Every structure is written in C-alpha cells, then in structure tokens.
Amino acid sequence: QLGSPTALADPETERRLREAAARGGHTLYVPRGALWGCEDIRRMDEGGTLAALKVTMTKAPQSFHLEGWLQERLAAAVAAGGRAVLYEGPLRPLCPLAPNNVNTMAAAAVAAPSLGFDGVRACLVADPSVPDWHIVEVEVTSVGDEGRALSVTSTRRNPAAPGAVTGNATRHAFWSSL
C-alpha cells in the first residue's frame, strides 16, 4: 500500500514499487483519499471513453506547503491578498513542487492511466476567503461525437483547520478506501 500517490509522479519510483509488488505476488494499492468519483473515472478510462480530466484544488494560502518557484508564487499571492491561481497545467511537474498538497490529483492520474500524470490537468488555487475549507473540483469529459461529449463536474468542500494540509474528512476517506 502506498500512502502518498504523489510519489508515483516519478516514473522510476512507480516502476520500482510495481515491480516489488509483483515480485511478492501483490498489487500496488493506491488509496483514493479525497478523490470523488474515482470508480467512475476508472470505468471511463478502462472503457476508452475518458477524454479529459482536470482537478482544481482551492485552499487558504497557509494550507499549502510548497517547494521551489511555487513558494515565491504563493508569497506573491499572500502579499496581493486575493485569490490567485498558483499553477495550472499538467500534473507531473506540479507533484515535486507540492508533494503534500496534490495527493488527490495524483489519485486521479492513477485512476486514469490513459491520461496519467502528463494528461491529467491540475490547477492549484490559493484563496484567503476559504480559511477553513479545502475545495476539490473534479471535471471529467468523455469522448464525443460532433463536438458533443458527456461532462461531469463534482465539487467536494472539506472542512479543515486553518493552515492544515489535510481536510477533516480526508483521513476517514483515506482509511475507508482501503
């Protein structure tokens, strides 16, 4: 079992973990944590109907524990005092910059291997107006004919202690997904 799916953003780590599990006759289990709709995403991916997946995570600035240039972007957002998009793009490059904050996004990449860490879109938002909430929005789009496709958006509002990296309900969601 893997506690932090963000670790799988490193292809070598993922390869070594999967090989070790296979040698022992096991499967590498990745809990979904705060990812709502994980089973539906997986079914769409397996059925070849998943076209796009975007996960947006919005938290108070003090709930982020960031690395590298994202620390500077967060500091600028705090100084400006308003809502700020810290990152928007493919998930893989975000993982080492926010390893404590993007496990839900990483679970989405694992649930949708056809998209993976390079195809899942990630958006990280710092918003001081939500000091005690972590908000996860998952946008799923299917393949479609003539520009018409199924689209599903879910929003999960998780109460959180001010400054907490993990919301109150996430711990229970993690353990219940085992």
Question: Predicted regions: what is each one?
Answer:
Residues Q1-L2, G89:
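Conserved acidic functional residues
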